[in-house]
Amino acid sequence: MTLEPDIYLKKIIREQRRVSTIRTSENKFEKHTLYIGDLDSSVEEGDLYTKFSEFTHDISSVKVCCDRNTGLSLGYGYVNFNHSSQAKTAMEVLNYCKLKGKPMRIMFSERDPSNRMSGRGNVFVKNLDESIDNKQLCDMFSAFGKVLSCKVARDASGVSKGYGFVQFYSDLSVYTACNFHNGTLIRNQHIHVCPFVSRGQWDKSRVFTNVYVKNLVETATDADLKRLFGEFGEITSAVVMKDGEGKSRRFGFVNFEKAEAAVTAIEKMNGVVVDEKELHVGRAQRKTNRTEDLKAKFELEKIIRDMKTRKGMNLYVKNLDDSVDNTKLEELFSEFGTITSCKVMVHSNGISKGVGFVEFSTSEEASKAMLKMNGKMVGNKPIYVSLAQCKEQHKLHLQTQFNNPPPSPHQQPIFSQVVAPATMLSQQTPLRGYNFQPYSMCGSRMPNSCPPISIPNFMVPQPFRPTLYPPAPLVGLYGSLPQPLLQPNLWNPYRRF
């Protein structure tokens, strides 16, 4: 079932085209805070810290939000990280993991309430089987783009209400998912998928009085329009449009006094056959709005046509371990059906790029493999499996990503590219605050980095900061360098060499 572009889809299209200006503020700063939702009422801050510290020790603070009056948990909290890269990885690993029997729903914290309440990128899914949880709902829709959050609505006893919500990063993913998944049979139930529209927006969009009527007979007059639509309410004007010679253009407009009458007229008269002509009745729009709808419909049908051509048989696999080759990749997916082609992409020197493609003989086999293999640990990495995108869809996706770059990892200081001989290396052990390197980085090497170079007879004055930590070893291009013994009380930041 195809979702026809309407007023709600048109609104999404306009937001998609100006997304670069809407979301600019989101990317000014790195995101270090994760929102943890759907927490059990008994979860405390210590429980949350213990759960996340199993994955990383890069945690700066933990907070479980409680009611100000009763002190009871509100069912959500926050975890702050020192590095945004650690926050992103923790979200990917721990999202939907259980804490005290309930799966956590994790996403980046959004401090701007206008963005939280905008409903941008949201999809409404109903007629879900009661056995489908948040994780399974996310797996169903992750093939259409980056998913920020998934939630299945439940009653007080924890039983599914049969509907849920999926929030995408890109609005393009919204109507692609709606057209591909709407009417799909999932666990013996046909699900209904559509863009989420708040009750306020829905009511506001229905407030109109002017109706457009197309495919009239050439002999139709203004009086015929009034007679045809008069039963639905009082009409203020009705006109059949004519060309310069006075001939009917076979369409016209009917303006009602009340909006309810206009809505009823569309519902009752659209598709009705009058004088052997099937009428098309809808809300009257400006020419610019109609042009946007036609463009949106064309772009949407092109994407759906390409997806139907491929029939969802080609899968895109990323985050592959370097040890995975064509044979290994085929072995991983062979249990789900007949594989027609399998390829791991490599660089010119033969090293794996960490991505590949697997094409099945049927879309059912590909869907089964995607649901089962997405997030599965292969080697030491979880692989991510989605439907391979057509060229045009991939181009639009890249354009969206370019306009909305994700938060970049925390940048470490980059030192000079020049490699100094060992005799020129500083013989002073860096203290905290002066070229100090955290213990988590000891024995490792940052890309494009080398030890700081000591310039003879020159030292940048730095205030002395006493520390309780022992000095960390210098890290060279090939690991830790041998450290000279440093006698106590000989360190002087103002000393000249």
Swiss-Prot record:
MF terms in GO: mRNA 3'-UTR binding; poly(A) binding; poly(U) RNA binding
Tissue-level expression: Expressed predominantly in roots but also at lower levels in immature flowers.
Keyword Nucleus included in the entry's annotation: yes
Major localization listed first in the record, in broad terms: cytoplasm
Start and end residues of each RRM domain: 32-111, 121-198, 209-286, 313-390
Keyword Nucleus: yes
Cellular component aspect of the GO annotation: cytosol; nucleus; ribonucleoprotein complex
InterPro entries reported for this sequence: Euk_RNA-bind_prot, Nucleotide-bd_a/b_plait_sf, PABP_1234, RBD_domain_sf, RRM_dom, RRM_dom_euk
Miscellaneous information on this protein: A.thaliana contains 8 PABP genes.
Family annotation (NCBIfam families): PABP-1234 (TIGR01628)
Protein name, as recorded: Polyadenylate-binding protein 1
Organism: Arabidopsis thaliana (Mouse-ear cress)
